[in-house]
Structure formats: C-alpha cells, structure tokens
C-alpha cells in the first residue's frame, strides 16, 4: 500500500502538504524495520508511532493527535487503493466541496479471491449484507449521509475509507475505545458506525464520495456459513450495546430490527424484561427459529440461510442486553451503597 501511495504521489501536480501516519499497535514482527527501510527511499513525509493500547479505535485516536493536516484520511492496512485514490483525496483536501462538510465517506469494493459458493446470495430480499465482506458501495452519485439502504438500515461512512476534518475530533470527541477490532470492551465492530451516527445527531454534514475507491480482498474463509453467522452475532451484540450505552444511549428498550413506523403497535409487555432480557428479543428469537425450522422443508435455501444469520444476530443482541442489564444493576447498587454510607435509606426494589 505504501508503494501505491508513493507512486500516486509522484503523479500529482502538487506534491506538498501530504503526510502519512502509521500506527503500530504493539506488533511483534518486523513492521518497524520494513517501514524505516521504506522511509529511507522516499520523499514522502512518513511518521511512524507505536500505540500500546490495543484496539483500532485507540490507534485512530492516537493518530489524530499526531496529525498536522486539516483533512485526515483513514484507511486499513489490508486494502488496495484505486489508481486515482490519492488524486481524488487531494481534491477533497483542496476544498472542492462545501467547507461545512465534516466527513467524506469513500467507496469500498470487495475483491473476491474465489468464486461465490452456490448458496451465497447478495441480492435482496434475503441477501447477505455487503458489510460482511467489508463492502461500502452505494452507487456512483454523491449523496448525504445517512441514507436508507436496500437492507432497510440507515447508512453511515465506513472506517475502511473515510476522510474527516481534524476539527471534528477537537469539537465532538473521538472514537469509542470499547468498540472495534481488538478493543478492550470486547465489541469488535461498529466503532466507526457509532462515531458517525453520533456526528449525525450533532448535525455534522457527511457526504458519500464514490470516486474515492479502495478494494478489500475477501478470502475464501470469509465466505463460509460459519463466518457469516459469527459476523451477524458480533453485529447484533455491538448494535445493542451501542444503542444502550455511553453517548448513544437512547430508548431503554429499543425494538432493534423493527421499523420505527411499526414500533408503536408492539404490545407494551414485549418491551418489558424477563431475566434481564427484553421479552421482545425472546419472542424474536423464538419466531425466527420456528420459521427457520419450517424452511427446512422449502426449496428456498436463500431464505433459510438468511434466517440463520438473523437468529445469530438476535443471539448477539440477547447476550449484549444481559451485559447492559448487569451494568445497570451494578450502577444501581453502587448508587444505593453511596446513599447508605451517607445515612440515607430508600426503597430500591
């Protein structure tokens, strides 16, 4: 990737005001040796740092403190750049868009290293979400985030390929370090989604820029049923956690996966909890499982697989809801203990 950036940099009419920041997340290989060897043979401004706190979010936040530019580009180390990526990124930095826009979300296209399995379906209505394969491709036209997708979800930029003005971090905060790959909190995704959804709540303009393209390799191991189920489980787990904690905490019992238009008709009892888990999630798991069993007698394998993925996602939500309930109870008893120490008593039941 460094070679690609160096090659594209030489083609720019102006080669100033570009720096590369590499953050080594406490690796034990020869990463530092490779980087220093590359730095000696290029005119690019490359800064190399080590962040001991594990997690992609921690690395991003650390990189922000070391960056001197006004527009920061974030990409992963396992992607391939489109031949015009740096040129298009430089156009963003030059201010070819409204200066009020705080975030530009680029396109990420999966690079399939093997033909699709016969069972794998990417099309509606029972298609696997492209995010499973690190895809973020929504047409050739620029448009403002968030926008609705074919999956019925609100879409935000992907951390695989995104450009953020540095002042955003100064004014709005950083990525949550309990989310994302290798995060201490154990929630290995939605670190970028949570951050951009939060910016959307703050009315920060964000635009999808499809001309800034990266390609993400997809190995055969990523295209297995087990891996996709694992992805949906982690997604459901992180989705519920994000909705109930920290700066994104909303309705204490959101009906995740249900269109807001229909949430009002859900019976009140379904929003209550049974053993720390909303009854709605118990019901959701039950009915999905029943339908999945029925589909075993059907020839519609795409729907059967889709149902198994949704069951995995619901199981993740159930696990996260139990963790949230545990956290709430812990805070409740901690508050009670503080009152008791002060000689104040109350009925907490």
Where are these regions (language model features)?
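Short, well-formed alpha-helical segments that are part of the catalytic scaffolds
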Residues: 1-10
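A conserved acidic beta->alpha catalytic loop
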Residues: 24-33, 79
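Glycine-rich, basic loop-to-helix element that forms the pyrophosphate-binding segment
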Residues: 51-67
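Short aromatic/hydrophobic "clamp" motif used to bind/position activated sugar donors
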Residues: 72
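Conserved donor NDP-sugar-binding/catalytic core segment of glycosyltransferases
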Residues: 84-125
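Short, flexible, basic/aromatic active-site loop/helix in glycosyltransferases
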Residues: 124-154
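Acidic donor-binding loop at a coil-to-helix junction in glycosyltransferase catalytic cores
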Residues: 157-159, 181-195
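Active-site-adjacent helix/loop segment of glycosyltransferases
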Residues: 206, 210-305
